[in-house]
From Swiss-Prot:
May be involved in the degradation of proteins for nutrient acquisition or possess a regulatory function by proteolytic activation of proproteins. This is Putative subtilisin-like proteinase 1. GO terms for molecular function: serine-type endopeptidase activity. GO terms for biological process: proteolysis; sporulation resulting in formation of a cellular spore. The gene is SPL1. InterPro entries: PCSK9_ProteinaseK-like, Peptidase_S8/S53_dom, Peptidase_S8/S53_dom_sf, Peptidase_S8_Asp-AS, Peptidase_S8_His-AS, Peptidase_S8_Ser-AS, Peptidase_S8_subtilisin-like, Peptidase_S8_subtilisin-rel.
Length: 465
């Protein structure tokens, strides 16, 4: 009797998922050194991966890879890795409801019969057929990136100021199939519905036609903005150097630029170099870049870290608090400390019933029954913190039209300029008084910080006199 021994190949199936890996890189490093470090980190990360695991999306300071939980744990222990986070779903923060003025020598423009949200941000007392006052040239020279479902860039509201930036949704057309992104863009920079009237709108598609997506796509969108921001920074430096040379400056001075706002020269400081520095100082060397994130999902450390990283490069972020009627600190990007997080307020200056709250919310802005642009060249009324955040994005662009604030400074300025309105609602929506703040005069009464550009308007008037 022959005993046949059969050797069986046992295949162990390990569950793999998409993980976001962020490197512990300093954004102030010069680009050459950062590139070397990044390539080295990628090489070492690939050595950690198993043969059936792979890196998919690469970003400025990290990547997305399909790997097992055990590999992710090993990756976390690498000294160059800041964090490893499982990719997670995100979606729009909007709730659907189907239902210009004249120049002044003061530098202020009035739009009559403006949408109530604009009137409120401009400080108008009458919100019914109210007037919206805003600085002349508001938004000029500012690029606002709308990371969303896309933007209908041909919509009449944008008057040629909108362009397509990038599309990170696989197998989807380069257009807004939903309407949410177009609505947000209209609140930011529409000629009738916008807080600013001259800002440039750049569409970055990270959500599909259903308003859904993944955190990894958002990170790709942020990475795209970083690359465009750094490219514009180089262009500004080159323009400043050209201005110096055209004014008779020495052409034998070699400038070494590392992507930051500092220079190193190949020869000691001389009067000619000082003239170059003076020429450069007359330029706004930091591009004026704003990102609107009217999206949300559960708190994600990788997304918050990416926003902080980009903010350190000079990019301003406005995020929606979310519509769960819960603590905004439990969601991203609303929990980001580097962004300005906006909750939704009503025309009665109360917190909208759906808005998230808590200490992570910096200001409240109009978010109920907001009229703005929609796909198909139409307009629509929509509610949500998705509509509140674009009011803040527009305000950021308005401030940047006149002042060169870095993100931290401007966040403090906008919070400081907010109007503190007594909350008359009976809904104890957070139950902790973490936010809104108790009144200094009556601890039983709460104050809502409502987004307002009144103080900016006063500064512009004084500046124009």
């Amino acid at each position: 009797m022959i005993l046949a021994i059969i050797s069986l190949s046992v295949v162990i199936c390990r569950e793999v998922s998409d993980y976001i890996v962020m490197f512990d890189q300093d954004p102030s490093m010069d680009r050459a050194s950062m590139k070397v470090l990044y390539n080295m980190n990628i090489h070492e990360a690939q050595n950690i991966l198993r043969p059936d695991e792979s890196i998919g999306i690469k970003m400025t300071n990290g990547f997305v890879a399909r790997m097992s939980e055990s590999t992710a744990e090993r990756m976390k222990r690498h000294p160059s890795v800041k964090m490893v986070v499982k990719d997670s779903p995100v979606g729009i923060s909007g709730l659907k409801f189907d239902v210009p003025g004249s120049d002044d020598r003061s530098g202020i423009v009035m739009q009559r019969h403006a949408p109530w949200g604009l009137a409120r941000v401009g400080g108008s007392v009458s919100l019914v057929h109210g007037n919206y006052c805003y600085p002349i040239n508001s938004g000029k020279g500012v690029d606002v990136y709308v990371l969303d479902t896309g933007v209908e860039i041909e919509h009449p509201e944008f008057g040629g100021r909108a362009r397509w930036g990038a599309n990170f949704v696989p197998k989807s057309p380069d257009r807004d199939e939903h309407g949410h992104g177009t609505h947000c863009a209209g609140v930011i920079g529409g000629k009738n519905f916008g807080v600013t009237k001259e800002s440039s709108i750049i569409a970055v598609k990270v959500l599909d036609k259903y308003g859904s997506g993944m955190t990894s796509r958002l990170l790709q969108g942020v990475d795209f903005v970083i690359k465009e921001h750094e490219k514009k920074k180089d262009e500004l430096y080159n323009a400043a150097a050209d201005e110096y040379l055209s004014s008779g400056g020495s052409s034998d001075i070699e400038i070494e630029m590392d992507g930051s706002e500092s220079f190193s020269f190949v020869q000691p400081e001389t009067p000619s170099i000082q003239r170059l520095v003076d020429a450069i100082s007359r330029k706004a060397l930091q591009p004026k870049t704003v990102v609107n994130l009217s999206v949300g999902g559960f708190r994600n450390a990788a997304l918050n870290f990416a926003i902080e990283y980009a903010s350190r490069l000079g990019i301003h972020f406005s995020t929606a608090a979310g519509n769960e009627h819960e603590d905004a600190c439990d969601f991203s990007p609303g929990s980001s400390r580097a962004a300005i997080t906006t909750g939704a307020s009503t025309y009665r200056d109360t917190v909208a019933f759906f808005s998230n709250f808590g200490k992570c919310v910096n200001v409240f802005a109009p978010g109920v029954d907001i009229l703005s642009s929609w796909i198909g060249g139409t307009q629509k009324i929509v509610s949500g913190t998705s509509m509140a955040a674009p009011h803040t994005s527009g305000a950021i662009a308005a401030y940047l039209t006149y002042y060169d604030y870095d993100p931290h400074m401007l966040k403090s300025r906008i919070i400081g300029d907010a109007r503190l309105i007594e909350d008359v609602s009976e809904d104890d929506y957070d139950g902790t008084t973490i936010w809104p703040l108790p009144s200094l005069f009556n601890a039983n009464k709460k104050k809502l910080p409502i987004l307002s550009m009144e103080r900016l308007l006063r500064r512009v008037r004084n500046k124009m006199r």
